[in-house]
Curated annotation (Swiss-Prot):
Primary subcellular site in the record, as a coarse category: cytoplasm
Lineage: Archaea, Methanobacteriati, Methanobacteriota, Methanomada group, Methanobacteria
Name recorded for this polypeptide: 4-hydroxy-tetrahydrodipicolinate synthase
Organism: Methanosphaera stadtmanae (strain ATCC 43021 / DSM 3091 / JCM 11832 / MCB-3)
Segments crossing the lipid bilayer: none
Subunit-structure text: Homotetramer; dimer of dimers.
Cellular compartment(s): Cytoplasm
Site location (Part of a proton relay during catalysis): T45, Y108
Residue numbers binding pyruvate: T46, I209
One MF annotation (Gene Ontology) recorded for this entry: 2-dehydro-3-deoxy-phosphogluconate aldolase activity
Any one GO BP annotation for this protein: diaminopimelate biosynthetic process
Catalysis performed (reactions): L-aspartate 4-semialdehyde + pyruvate = (2S,4S)-4-hydroxy-2,3,4,5-tetrahydrodipicolinate + H2O + H(+)
Pfam families: DHDPS (PF00701)
Function of the protein: Catalyzes the condensation of (S)-aspartate-beta-semialdehyde [(S)-ASA] and pyruvate to 4-hydroxy-tetrahydrodipicolinate (HTPA).
Gene name of the encoded protein: dapA
Length: 297
């Protein structure tokens, strides 16, 4: 399937009582689509999936699919450190009408490489749905090896990887292997780090699952589209202009800075689920300055 372009790892708006704010979520989805993004992700890390109940997890997927209404690619966060739970979430995502599922590598229990492969192999065999594998060793404690990524690329339903390991040398090995084994046409590599999207596209990535696009969907999409079309001078300019914003969104635990930025912009997306706290006053001053530099407040 075509996964080129800019996909947004969406925040989840909450009411004052910390329940999901469906009205704001639908408004936010429209804001992103009108901003020119190619896809949206519900119940990812930025969407606070770790602190959503199963019912809430399913609800945000349902809202996303309904509100998008075929206008963009819908990606359902469906990962778990229990393979059986991931299987249930992928199957739910398919039944809900999502286009593709995003499945993080199992976290905390730190399976060996064979365990990681078997996790995705079971999902491949038992779920009739395209799956994006998500590799983010800084959060999970495990890193898909080059060999494992290549093996996953050979599975029919594992159609892409969101690669958030910042090691560009490793990525070069991945692309060399994908090319030599004629897998590039059927397997997509997406950036999982906004600041590395441009260099990753230059190596062969087809886009990004982005956090900064929550704030500036149009500019992020324009940067990615220029890079994909080979207009690297323009893409580089836009990437450099976006860098301080990309960086400040991780000045504290994500998605705290992103949600604070959106609230400062008047988007009224609510607070955070514990144990994530609001950002400190000192960092809010820094965040405000960068938002002002980008004419966002």
């Amino acid at each position: 399937m075509n996964l080129e372009g800019t996909h947004v790892a969406m925040i989840t708006p909450f009411n004052n009582d910390n329940t999901i704010n469906e009205e704001k979520y639908r408004e936010f989805i429209d804001f992103l689509i009108e901003g020119g993004v190619d896809g949206i992700l519900a119940a990812g890390t930025t969407g606070e999936s770790a602190t959503l109940t199963l019912e809430e997890h399913q609800k945000v997927i349902d809202i996303m699919v309904d509100q998008a209404n075929g206008r963009v690619t819908t990606i359902a966060g469906a990962g778990s450190n229990a393979t059986s739970e991931a299987l249930d979430l992928v199957n739910y995502s398919k039944d809900a009408g999502a286009d593709v599922a995003l499945v993080i590598t199992p976290y905390y229990n730190k399976p060996q490489q064979s365990g990681l492969y078997n996790h995705f192999k079971l999902l491949n065999d038992q779920c009739d749905m395209p799956i994006i594998a998500y590799n983010v060793p800084s959060r999970t404690g495990v890193d898909l090896s080059v060999d494992n990524i290549i093996n996953l690329a050979k599975l029919d339903n594992i159609v892409a990887i969101k690669e958030a390991n910042p090691d560009l040398n490793k990525l070069a090995h991945v692309f060399s292997r994908l090319n030599s084994e004629n897998l590039l046409d059927d397997f997509t590599v997406l950036s999982g780090n906004d600041s590395l999207t441009l260099p990753m596209i230059s190596q062969g990535s087809k886009g990004v699952i982005s956090v900064v696009a929550n704030i500036m969907p149009n500019k992020t999409s324009t940067m990615v589209n220029n890079a994909l079309n080979g207009n690297y001078d323009e893409a580089r300019t836009l990437s450099n202009e976006l860098f301080n914003l990309m960086d400040v969104l991780f000045i504290e635990a994500s998605p705290a800075p992103t949600k604070r930025a959106l609230n400062l912009m008047g988007m009224d997306v609510g607070g955070l689920r514990m144990p994530i706290n609001e950002i400190c006053d000192e960092n809010e001053v820094i965040l405000k300055e960068i938002l002002k530099e980008n004419n966002l407040i």
